[in-house]
Curated annotation (Swiss-Prot):
InterPro entries: aa-tRNA-synth_I_CS, Arg-tRNA-ligase, Arg-tRNA-synth_N, Arg-tRNA-synth_N_sf, ArgRS_core, DALR_anticod-bd, Rossmann-like_a/b/a_fold, tRNAsynth_Ia_anticodon-bd. Pfam families: Arg_tRNA_synt_N, DALR_1, tRNA-synt_1d. It is found in: Cytoplasm. It comes from Blochmanniella floridana. This is Arginine--tRNA ligase.
């Protein structure tokens, strides 16, 4: 049930009837911000009236008389300076809310399926995941869940940094210092691996001979040297195993099969170089291979911007890998849409790779490319979120601290729960709190991380919404005839303003998901779930459920509660957040 789309169709029909079809793109239908402006609002009428040179009130009256919302709207009225407010009919709302309780997927219709590649998380190998990976991982995973739920074929792509200079440095360091890397036990592996990386980076920056040796090992690795490949595989396997533990704990759907790292495209690179040369897109300059882009000119000299795709020593660059990656996703995976959740600093680099791929004919203009920029995680001083010593906070450290805080919070509430249940609840609350704190903010903005706020049971937080679900679950634990909810004789009827507002919000779940899927902005879903939880709280406060004397009223309100619980649970699930029957 997509009310917004239904109303937009009726708007288009009306504009066609009054010969203003050419102005369709000027009109928007959106949910009203306040109940006094109705349930929905049509915006943009003032733009059409200006084009037609007709007073806005006169044009709006013509439109209101033309639009067919019979049975859907109770009131349609003009609101200065140029809005049309729509108040939905309670009878129509009753009919629709009674219909969705019997439908699969909460009444959400599947849309035409597309192949959508989502590039997210993408940590570098040889390092532990840190808080900087959190937004890409969590937001990307939520969008993958939502698009899958709507019926798309989603291809998750974890484009890990498993190739390149850092491996030349590590191999050179292990060789130089005669490190027996195979002797490390499981608990030492990832921390020692990161230590080796840090030390090798110091030598790389300070010792020209070590830097040259590192570059030689990169080339040997790329050419398939057995010794280099053995070390490389061991290092990659350690990192992948460690990252998977983080993903599992975060309830992120990424698995080993979703890894499409830089190394995957290595065998394509010689062809890419040759093909770009044959198509006169790449040239040799000072023994390196370069593609010049007219669209990206050097601002000082107004010369075409050069993108190096192969170095003098024969080594390849990230740009070469990205071109091959785009080619693979379009020609092999047949992507219709490709979404990148990666660092905003990569934007220019991505645009260059896309442009080269377009010019080479690897992709068509029909493929939609989107770089969904993510803001930064800040501390209370609005500085990048780091340890007191200035180091980046490890993701495992953040998760452990969140668990401990949630555990103590539960104990302080004096819940009469056994140890196993407290642990389970602390896990659900802590992971939910961290994920929701990321997802509830507009992904394009920086935000301040605050422990007290994210673990609060009031306000727009995961614990508040999780508790709303738990409260509804507790209602159904008190009744013995849950099967009677399915009986047709018990219909939902809306006798109060609280019930009407709750029912409308329930019917808006579908259009909310469509908006989030189109824009890649899960904070809109978070806002919806918070609004739904708040409206249920008002309904619960003003409309007795189990204590009402009328059986029909009781089951009407139980059905509203049941649908609310289903949507809260599904909505949180689409954010990658679990619920609990107790709290």
């Amino acid at each position: 049930m997509n009310i917004q789309y239904l109303l937009l169709q009726r708007v288009h029909e009306a504009l066609t009837l009054i010969n203003t079809k050419s102005f369709l793109n000027l009109i928007q239908v959106q949910q009203s911000n306040h109940i006094r402006f109705g349930d929905y609002q049509i915006n943009g009428m003032i733009n059409i009236s200006k084009h037609l040179q007709i007073p806005i009130k006169d044009f709006s009256n013509i439109f209101i008389k033309t639009i067919n919302l019979k049975g859907i709207a109770k009131i349609i009225k003009f609101e200065p300076p140029g809005f049309i407010n729509i108040f939905l009919s309670p009878t129509w709302i009753e009919n629709k809310i009674n219909h969705i309780i019997d439908l699969p997927k909460l009444g959400i219709d599947l849309i035409p399926s597309k192949n959508i590649v989502i590039d997210y998380s993408s940590p570098n190998i040889a390092k532990e995941m840190h808080v900087g990976h959190l937004r890409s991982t969590i937001i990307g995973d939520s969008i993958a869940r939502i698009l899958s739920f709507l019926g798309h074929n989603v291809i998750r792509s974890n484009h890990i940094g498993d190739w390149g200079t850092q491996f030349g440095m590590l191999i050179a360091y292990i060789k130089k210092h005669k490190i027996n890397y195979l002797s490390l036990n499981d608990s030492q592996q990832i921390s020692m691996l990161e230590y080796y990386y840090q030390e090798s980076k110091k030598e790389y920056d300070s010792d020209p001979n070590f830097a040259e040796l590192s570059r030689k090992y990169v080339v040997k690795l790329q050419k398939g040297d057995v010794y280099c490949r053995k070390i490389w595989k061991y290092l990659v396997d350690i990192s992948i195993s460690n990252n998977q533990k983080i993903y599992d704990r975060l309830n992120v759907t990424l698995k080993k099969k979703d890894i499409m790292g830089e190394s995957m495209y290595h065998d394509m690179l010689p062809y890419i170089i040759t093909d770009l040369k044959n198509k006169k897109l790449a040239v040799t300059s000072d023994h390196a291979t370069i593609v010049f882009l007219n669209q990206n000119k050097n601002s000082k000299k107004n010369n075409p911007f050069g993108v190096i795709i192969q170095k003098k020593d024969g080594g390849y660059l990230y740009s070469t890998t990205d071109i091959a990656c785009i080619k693979y996703r379009c020609e092999t995976l047949h992507a219709d849409r490709i979404i990148y959740y990666i660092d905003s600093r990569q934007k220019q680099h991505l645009m260059q790779a896309w442009e080269i791929a377009y010019q080479a004919g690897y992709i068509t203009k029909a493929v939609v490319f989107e770089h969904h920029v993510c803001g930064m995680l800040l501390d209370k001083n609005k500085k990048p979120f780091k340890t007191r010593s200035g180091n980046t906070i490890k993701l495992i450290t953040l998760l452990n601290e969140a668990f401990n805080k949630a555990y103590n919070l539960i104990l302080n509430k004096n819940l009469n729960l056994e140890y196993k249940k407290i642990n389970h609840l602390a896990h659900i609350i802590s992971i939910g709190a961290i994920k929701y704190s990321e997802l509830s903010k507009n992904r394009t903005t920086n935000y301040i991380f605050n422990w007290d706020k994210i673990l609060n049971f009031d306000g727009n937080t995961a614990p508040y919404i999780q508790y709303a679900y738990t409260r509804i679950s507790s209602i159904f634990k008190k009744i013995n005839h849950r099967s009677e909810l399915q009986e047709k004789k018990y219909q939902i009827f809306l006798s109060s303003q609280e019930e009407i507002l709750l029912a409308i919000c329930l019917l808006q779940f579908h259009e909310t998901l469509i908006t989030v899927a189109d824009r890649g902005t899960p904070h809109i879903l978070c806002g919806y779930l918070y609004k739904l939880s708040t409206l249920f709280s008002l309904f619960y406060e003003h409309c007795p459920i189990l204590k009402t004397e009328c059986t029909y009223t009781k089951y009407s309100r139980l059905k509203l509660s049941f649908i609310t619980a289903q949507i809260l649970k599904k909505g949180l699930n689409l954010l990658g957040i679990e619920t609990s029957e107790y709290m």
